[in-house]
Amino acid sequence: MLPIDQIVTQAMAAEPERLRRHVAQLSIVRNQLLNPRAIDRVVRYIADEFDHAGLPVQAEPFHWWPSGWRRHKNLIATIPVPSAGDGGDERIIIGAHYDSVPFSPGADDNASGVAVLLEAARVCAGFGRAPRRRIDFIAFGMEEEGYVGSDHHASSLARRGVPVAAMVSLECVGYTDRRPHSQQIIPGLPIRVPDRGTFLAVIGNRPASPLADALERLVQLVAPKFESVTLVVDDNGRALPATRLSDHAPFWDRGYPALLLTDTAFLRNPHYHQPHDLPETLDVEFMTHVARCVVALTLTLAFGDLPREPAA
């Protein structure tokens, strides 16, 4: 197990200017059905950034019949385990979707998530040690059409019996609003939520409860002034459908422990799915805190013992 001070030091290597640059490059209307050339440009950018981080990149193709069986793809960059790794086939998955809805440049949704994904991959790769558990950084395609890419990947893992120690979905992680009452709240939430939109929401299924607890502890070490709010849902969030609206849901439905990290999207951001979802609306300091927390969690899970539910 790594000393926590080494994890914190490495997490602090996430740089705001890199996040800003990624968002600027990714914030173009990029929808597979309307402008596949823009999708190709974004895919090349993501692949190049993974390559610059020194990570092997694999394209995972899939088809979707409403698009005329056109081929789409996920991009997977991997930090492998050595052949004698004691984590076996277990893997850690950090994911974010790279597509946008038609007519929106999607800075928050979801250039912000991909930016954090790329920066987390760079910082984790720069740690320079082989982990106990394989780490996959995945840029998912076709999320806006119903989590098609992530569903394909989760289905493939489940079919092959591949164990997933943790999945983290990065969905809209760049928008804040410090005004009172700027945060909308889902009816029926079993927790209290601040009325200012300045926190990161961490939402997990029941198997991910220990992961959420571990992340809460790491937030206090990596970003003590950063506010996060955690919600663990039963029955994979079916009683609260808004908690299922991203690429973590296919993993929940196959029994894998998964967390959603989000600024809560339309519950806070008036630019959501609009032509004015632009880079200048984002809070890069907030994104930097998210990236550092993701790095800390990833390294903790990849190099240490997995957190468990306390014994009853």
Task: Cite the ranges covered by each PLM segment.
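Sec/Tat-exported extracytoplasmic proteins
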Residues: 23, 27-34, 50-54, 79, ...
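Extracytoplasmic/secreted proteins, especially bacterial periplasmic and envelope-associated proteins
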Residues: 18-21, 25, 37, 41, ...
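Active-site-adjacent substrate-binding region
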Residues: 180-312
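Acidic/histidine-rich catalytic neighborhood of metal-dependent amide-processing enzymes
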Residues: 70-71, 100-213, 240-243
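N-terminal capping segment at the start of a domain
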Residues: 1-38, 99, 268-277
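Proline/glycine-enriched tight loop/beta-turn segments at coil->beta junctions
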Residues: 82-91
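Structural recognition of the beta-strand scaffold that forms the well-ordered cores
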Residues: 22-25, 76-78, 92-95, 136-139, ...
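A non-catalytic alpha/beta surface segment that caps or lines the substrate-entry region
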Residues: 21-82, 228-232
